[in-house]
């Protein structure tokens, strides 16, 4: 399996978290409710999604699950890839 095969289409949305939890910025990105991944999972992707669109906008992007030893898993999408704006 090539590294690119580890990526899959994931629908995410922008939101303002109730607590920062050590992350930077006002607007964050998370998986949408009812999808494969829990909404508590952080998404690392292009800042364009959180800066240039209204809060609540949904996107489809290519992402992979990064499993960190000791927890702290997150979804990663290369910042240079285009995301599809869904709403």
What are these regions (language model features)?
Residues 2-22:
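Structural detector for short beta-strands of small beta-barrel domains
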Residues 12, 18, 43, 61-63:
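Short, surface-exposed loop motifs enriched in S/T, G, D/E and P with embedded aromatic residues
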Residues 18-41:
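OB-fold (S1/OB) nucleic-acid-binding surfaces
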Residues 25, 39, 55-59, 77-81:
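A generic structural signal for short beta-strands and their flanking turns/coil linkers
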Residues 33, 47, 63-67:
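Short glycine-rich, polar/acidic loop-and-turn segments at beta strand-coil junctions
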Residues 36-52:
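Beta-strand/loop nucleic-acid-binding surfaces
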Residues 56-70:
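Flexible glycine-rich surface loops and low-complexity tracts that mediate binding to linear polymers
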Residues 66-87:
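OB-fold/S1-family single-stranded nucleic acid-binding modules
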